[in-house]
Structures are given as C-alpha cells and as structure tokens.
C-alpha cells in the first residue's frame, strides 16, 4: 500500500526541533489511536460528550470544570469571548456588538508575541481589545494594575518560551492583581507540562495544547472556574462553531491526558543522557561547537545548542538541512547569534 509521503508527493521530515506546530507537533500512542478509532466508529450526543469528558478531566486535574476545544488558540479566542459575554446568548450570537463595551484584555507587553499568529489576533477573534501593560523588557504587578479600568474584561498571561522571561511578574502575582480588582485571569500555558500549578496559583481559566506536552491529537483544553467554563462552552453557539472539535479527537485527547498523568513526560536528566552522544559527535567536527542547554523558559527540558563558526552561517546551515530529503528541522530562534 502506498504511504502518504508517496501518495501526496511529500518530503519526509526528521524532527530535530521539538513539538512544533509546523511539523505536526507530536506522535500519539496506540491507546490514543484506539480511542480516536472508537470515536470515529460510533455516534454520541455531542453536547453530552463535551460535558462528560470535561467533567472527567476536571476531576483528574482537580479543577472545577474543563472544556475540550480544537486548539490552544481556539481556547484563547473562546475564553476571551466567554469573559466578555458572561453567559449572554445575545452576545454569543452578536460577539462584536457595540452594546458591550467591557472588552479590554490587559496583557503584559512582553507577552504580546507571534507564536505562529500574534496573540492579539486570537484576542480580537474573541472580540477583545488588547491593552498592553508595562514595557517590552519588564512588567510588574503595578504595571498591570494601572491598566485596569471599568472596561477591563480580563487579564491574559502567556506562559511560553516565546515571551520575554526577565523582569516579568509571575502568574501568582498576576492572580493577586486580578483578585484584588475582581477581574478574571486567563493563563495560556499551551506547551506547559504541569497541568495543576496555574490553577493552584490562582488563574481562573488555564489553556493547554493537546498535542504538545500531552502528546495527544489536535486539541486544546480550557480548565478553571465552573461558571467561566459554562460561558466557554456557550461559545459553541457563537465563534466556537468555526472551531469545533470532532468526537474522535475528544476521546483521543482524553485518553492522552490519562496517559500523561499516569506516566508523565521524559525527565530532564533522561534528556541530558540522550543528548550526550550527539553533543560529543558534533564536537568532533570542525567549525561546530555543541553543548547541552536548558529551556529558556525554565522548564525541565534540555536541548543541544550548536554554535556555527565556519564558512557558512547558522542560517545557511539550517536552510541546507531543510533542503535535503529527508528534511531536517532544527530550532531557529538563535540563528542570528550563530546558534542552532
């Protein structure tokens, strides 16, 4: 039988980058595939499936409630819309109505990043208006506090390696500001590995990607306060209709969360051991110097960092690797500094 690479004339890819959206993120387990297959072969009352899988996951994650959505980006848009509409069916049908003025989403300036699309695009899709707090290189609780007004619908905090890491308030600090002003706090923790800490830190809604740390199918998860999750679920009658997720991925994702909580992700120590032979081999080559480095966002993730000091620049090496078949994809964020 012809495989998909042959059938669609696709280039094979070696993923040396990580769980990246542009490469299809991650591989799923046999149990997840079996759950997806069961979903694909059976019928359900979709509203019941949504509520019951959400309640099941909420119990596992020690949260009030949860809602599976199609992606973390959809989670941002629907969470923003939910906190603007506050359970109003009129709003769900008229998400951008001028009758509702409380639309401002306070976001640390260093968190207003492009992770494949700008954060503010997803906020705008939910009907929100970004109000930046602080500066590109710093944002304190006071910076966030001074931007809150009667038009504030929520505070949004992006926990990601894409964002500025230094001199930024913590999630716990953002939660204290939110609680003091009785404003909900949304935390986008798309690629984060800890499914408990942000709820415990005081976030009202926390968003995860289904296919990154959790290694499930394309999906997203919003966990948090029951009232707010009910409002998120209502968005299925509004903007969420364009972002709906299928029964197969709902069941596959739920299985992936169960497996993730049972087995966890690979430890940083294990990653370092796996990287050692690679780093040693690279260091035997001329014009390249490799070392093991920790993830820039402080997660227990380790990667090989390769410094290019030769006739070709890091950018040229990266492009040459991608041009081959199979294509080899690396992380390119430090290419300007000569690092792969």
Model-derived segments and spans:
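Conserved C-terminal alpha-helix-loop-beta "cap" of PLP-dependent enzymes
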Residues: 4, 287-340
